[in-house]
């Protein structure tokens, strides 16, 4: 990336959880922003550890903050470990932001992970049946 391109991306760094971007993150942020601004989607396939979560969040936050009117970002994950990465990333990001610019985060986990009943850890079909009867 040239110096010109790097300075063009400097604004996106403000929404990263770390002071410096990992290789490939700035390009991903740029591609995500472009897709979001055009009302489209961006599908990223990259190796583990490149910082896809942080880059996607940085782009989404930038797009939300520069949009007309308030915007909400929904970040869905299929695993609790991925969920934790999103929460931790936002916490690290907020540690770098002034109070008036912090990102508000509401996180939710699956119903069986919030249930205090002993049957919550049973098989999903059994849990659904017992939970519906317990209501």
What are the residue ranges of the model-derived segments?
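A substrate-engagement module of RecA-like helicase motors
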Residues: 2-15, 19-23, 67-135
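Histidine (H) residue identity feature
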Residues: 18, 30, 41-42, 83
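N-terminal pre-P-loop "Q-motif" helix
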Residues: 19-36
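Generic hydrophobic, aliphatic-rich segments that mediate packing or membrane embedding
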Residues: 28, 53-59, 82-89
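Walker A/P-loop
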Residues: 38-59
């Amino acid at each position: 990336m040239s110096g010109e391109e790097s300075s063009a991306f400097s604004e996106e760094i403000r929404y990263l959880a770390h002071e410096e971007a990992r290789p490939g993150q700035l390009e991903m942020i740029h591609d995500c922003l472009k897709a979001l601004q055009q009302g489209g989607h961006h599908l990223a396939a990259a190796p583990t550890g490149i910082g896809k979560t942080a880059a996607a969040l940085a782009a989404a936050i930038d797009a939300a903050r520069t949009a007309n009117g308030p915007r909400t970002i929904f970040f869905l994950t299929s695993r609790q470990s991925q969920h934790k990465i999103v929460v931790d990333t936002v916490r690290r990001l907020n540690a770098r932001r002034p109070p008036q610019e912090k990102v508000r985060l509401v996180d939710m986990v699956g119903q069986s992970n919030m249930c205090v009943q002993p049957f919550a850890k049973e098989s999903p079909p059994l849990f659904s049946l017992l939970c519906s009867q317990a209501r």
